[in-house]
């Protein structure tokens, strides 16, 4: 086993994690940045492997200059010993070890290919959790057909492999994220047949203060809309995908227009041909590690389970801070601000002398959080999506559990919350452990019991004692109890 001793461990190297690490390191704290990716940037600044082909980052990435300058500075600090960068390290458990935290990692495929296979434990006096989020998916007829992918998956293929997902693509769901996905596909050769948006941006008229506090967001959206117009991509607001069509693979989608009550208008259903459907209903915060540590949570405006933090981004667990999507989905700009606040607060708790004034950051965070709250209210998931789930609609792909099995677990077997439904019908018990079907199962359970979705429903699919797949041999080996004297193996 390889062990490292640092002042602060930052888990996650996306926008929030990079900002936290740099803020703390520049304040004089020795920092370890631990991330599952082999290159920094997280999902937002995902980049292709070296040699993958010609690559112009500015065409795919927003805020690329900030990322590269931050990454360069962290590399410079790593050369001085102030920063330890652990890429390709999957954190599967975090445990209290006296007055420190033991961050247990297993290595991904790329480090193993270079001859490094020993497990790694990072001992740190403080933690910043910047674990990010993943695509939120909802079931609908035909969503398990080959050719139906997540909106984030389509973007990941483009950013990480320079691969366009299909020839004729429809981007659907709700939220501003659909625009950069469609824009990226169109700019790199795909024929984007349509963007099917369940809501309308006119809803921002109800939140003038939030829009004025984040004018950059408005300009960003206007830029995407202008480029889509130049590529002749039609954006259909207040429309939803009612079903994916095809036998062996996707051949088209059935869409319909929603009225002001969120119902499908009679006579508006029509078919659009496509070979790929990229669907996105927002994001689900990745909370395995915060829940493992016992951090308090609450439901956010978008019905996500998120970590509760104070003004310093501190969680309910002493010595642990959280930043970014784990504390509420709000985009990369908000994540970087929260990450910097968390990094500075963690550094101050360690006695760092040169901690910057955080008041401007807090004002910026307040504005961005206001915009995020407005965004979630403008782009809610329409009730009609889950209402149209017939008993035959597959919900859990891993265990092949349909919507009827979930309904019967509640109506016939008496389940009153999602954990019991999980035990009775087995949704979320397969390979993905509920990462794909968990939110939908929680919502369907709440619907059948006649109530709103609650924290316990969502915790049932995120509360895991092991945060990521780990070899059985690692579980069989004892964890290191002794604390190392310093960095080393």
Q: Can you annotate each of these PLM segments?
A:
Residues 2-425, 429-431, 435-489:
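Residues forming the flavin
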